[in-house]
Amino acid sequence: IQSTSMDQGILTEDSMNSFIRTLIQAGIWKNKVPKQTARTKDGTQTTVKKSEAEADATASQDTRLGFQPVVSVDAELLRQQRRFSSPRVLLSENTPLEPPPLYLTEEPVVLNRTSRRKREGKSHRGEYSVCDSESRWVTDKSSAVDIRGHQVTVLGEIRMGPS
């Protein structure tokens, strides 16, 4: 998911599927590489781990054929994938104690003065909320109004695989 599409509030189904597929491939297929059986010259069977390239090729082929692996995304997988952290999204099993702060983002130090002048107005985090404005955490909400005024469904859980 590119940050530009997140900033604009546009999240296509393809980008979400791509993100979920990346999570699955990075967290599950690299940790649990499939084994295949091979025969040695004397006829005995041995198990051999597939290389990462073969596992990725199998995953790519499965995706093209419409095969969706059925997995549960647990907290351990999310803890391992720190590179998917975002200032806008936090994946956690636990309900937060308080809402996230709406503070100014830190401006990086830039050597180019022209770039600095263009960005003099600081941007606020959290100004584009996907949910209705509430002063408390809402856990039982099933629908909301997005930033364009459209009614959207709030997912309570994400199911992966064929329905």
Swiss-Prot record:
GO terms for cellular component: axon; dendrite; extracellular space; synaptic vesicle. Glycans are attached at residue 112. PROSITE patterns: NGF_2. Residues 35-61 are annotated as: Disordered. Residues 4-119 form a propeptide. It is found in: Secreted. InterPro entries: Cystine-knot_cytokine, Nerve_growth_factor-like, Nerve_growth_factor-rel, Neurotrophin-3, NTF3_N. One of its GO terms (biological process) is modulation of chemical synaptic transmission. Coiled coil: none annotated. Residues 1-3 form the signal peptide. Belongs to the NGF-beta family. Seems to promote the survival of visceral and proprioceptive sensory neurons. This is Neurotrophin-3.
